Amino acid sequence: MEDLLAYLARALVDDPDAVEVEGFEEDDGTVVYELTVADDDVGKIIGRHGRTVNALRTVMRACAARDGRRVLLDVVD
C-alpha cells in the first residue's frame, strides 16, 4: 500500500523525488502512513478544502478494507 500511496502522490506534485512514505502499525492494529512532500507541494496534496487528501484517504481505506484493516494518512509538513 505504501507503493500505491507514493505513486499517487508523485503524480500530483511538482517534485516527485521529494515524496517519502513511511508506514508503521500502532498497538490497536491501525496502520499509519506519513506522507512527506516538498514544502511547495503540500498545498497540492491537501487540495482545495482538503478534497485531494480526503480522496487519497478514501482510496487507502478502500484498499485496507479488503484485508479488514484500518488505515490513517497523515501529511507531514
Q: How should these model regions be labeled?
A:
Residues 46-50:
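Glycine-centered tight-turn and secondary-structure capping sites
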